[in-house]
C-alpha cells in the first residue's frame, strides 16, 4: 500500500511495514516504522524540511530504504532535509536491514540549505549500508551536516546536540553556485562522530568552533577521503565563541587521503584568547596521504600530526 500525504504524528504510534510516501514527516511523540520511507518536498509550496522531530520524541525509522528529497525555490527560512531539536529528541535513521539512506537538497534559494541538522540537544543516529547526502543551493550556503548546541559550558554529553554516523559507507557532497559549501559544521559544543568509511567533497569539509567535537574514523580502521579545507571559524556577529574545537581526523590506509588545508576564517578579528587552535589532531598512517594546497603559518594552529 502506498500513501502520499503530509504526516503529522502527535501521539505514540508504530507504522506497519508498508511503503510511506509523504510530503513531509513531523514527529512530536515517540514513533517507529520498518517500512520504506520516501519524502519529497517542493519548498515553493511552503514546507522547508523533510523530517522534523521535536518535543523530546524518540523516533526510529529502520526500513530497507529511506529517501528524503527537497527541491524548488524559496527565500524564506532555512531549508533542511532532516532536523532533530530539543532536549531528549532522538531520531534513529536506518538499521540492520537498511540498504540506502539518501538525503538530497537541491534548491534555488539565498537561505542556508542543510542535509541533516541536530540543534539544541537534539540527536540523530544513522545506521545501514550506505548514507548519501547531497546538498546544492544556487545562492545560499550549503551544508551536508550541521550540529549546533548553542552552549559554551555544557559538561553532560547527553545534553549536547549530536550526529552519530554508524553507516558502513558515507558520502557527503555540498556545493553552492554563489556561496560557501561545507560538509560538516559543528559549533557551540555540537558533537559529530563518523565511524565508517567516509568521503566528503565541499569547499570546507569541516567547519568547527566553540568547543565542538568532531571525530572522523576514530578507530583508524576505515577509509577516509576528504576534498576541501578544515576551517576553524570565528563569528563575532553571532556566537562570538572561540575558534578552538576538539577535531580528530584519522587518515589510515593507502586509500585514505585529504586534499586541502587547515585554516581559520572570521567575520571580525577575534581576541587573542579566542584565536588559537589547540584541539586539532591529524593522523596520517599506513600510506595514507595529506595533500595540502597551501602551507599556512603554524602560529595560529597548534595541532598534532602523528
PLM features per residue range, with description:
Residues 23-203, 207-228, 234-259, 266-293, ...:
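Surface-exposed loop/turn motifs in large extracellular/passenger domains
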Residues 1-23:
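Gram-negative bacterial Sec-dependent N-terminal signal peptides
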Amino acid at each position: 500500500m502506498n500513501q502520499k500525504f503530509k504526516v503529522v504524528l502527535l501521539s505514540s504510534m508504530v507504522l506497519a511495514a508498508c511503503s510511506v510516501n509523504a510530503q513531509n514527516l513531523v514527529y512530536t511523540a515517540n514513533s517507529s516504522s520498518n517500512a520504506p520511507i520516501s519524502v519529497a518536498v517542493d519548498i515553493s509550496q511552503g514546507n522547508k524540511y523533510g523530517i522534523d522531530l521535536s518535543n523530546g520524541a524518540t523516533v526510529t525509522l529502520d526500513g530497507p530504504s529511506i529517501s528524503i528529497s527537497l527541491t524548488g525555490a524559496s527565500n524564506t527560512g532555512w531549508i533542511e532535509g532532516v532536523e532533530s531539536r530539543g532536549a531528549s529528541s532522538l531520531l534513529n535513521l536506518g538499521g540492520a536491514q537498511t540498504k540506502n539512506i539518501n538525503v538530497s537538497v537541491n534548491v534555488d534559494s539565498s537561505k542556508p540549505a542543510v542535509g541533516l541538522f541536530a540543534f539544541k540537544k537534539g540527536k540523530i543516529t544513522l545506521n545501514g549500508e550506505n548514507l548519501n547526502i547531497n546538498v546544492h543551493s544556487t545562492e545560499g550556503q550549503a551544508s551536508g551536516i550541521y550540529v549546533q548546541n548553542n552552549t559554551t559550558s555544557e559538561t553532560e554529553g547527553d545534553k549536547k546536540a549530536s550526529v552519530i554516523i554508524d553507516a558502513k559507507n558515507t558520502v557527503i557532497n555540498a556545493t553552492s553556485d554563489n556561496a560557501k559549501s561545507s560538509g560538516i559544521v559543528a559549533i557551540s559544543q555540537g558533537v559529530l562522530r563518523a565511524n565508517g568509511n567516509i568521503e566528503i567533497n565541499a569547499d570546507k569539509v569541516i567547519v568547527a568552533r566553540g568547543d565542538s567535537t568532531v571525530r572522523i574514523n576514530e578507530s583508524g580502521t576505515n577509509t577516509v577521503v576528504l576534498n576541501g579545507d578544515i576551517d576553524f571559524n570565528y563569528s563575532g556577529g553571532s556566537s562570538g565563541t572561540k575558534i578552538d574545537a576538539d577535531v580528530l581526523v584519522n587518515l589510515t590506509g593507502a586509500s585514505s587521503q585529504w586534499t586541502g588545508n587547515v585554516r581559520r576564517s572570521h567575520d571580525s578579528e577575534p581576541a587573542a584568547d579566542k584565536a588559537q587552535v589547540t584541539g586539532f589532531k591529524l593522523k596520517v598512517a599506513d600510506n595514507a596521504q595529506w595533500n595540502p594546497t597551501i602551507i599556512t603559518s603554524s602560529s595560529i594552529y597548534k595541532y598534532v600530526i602523528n
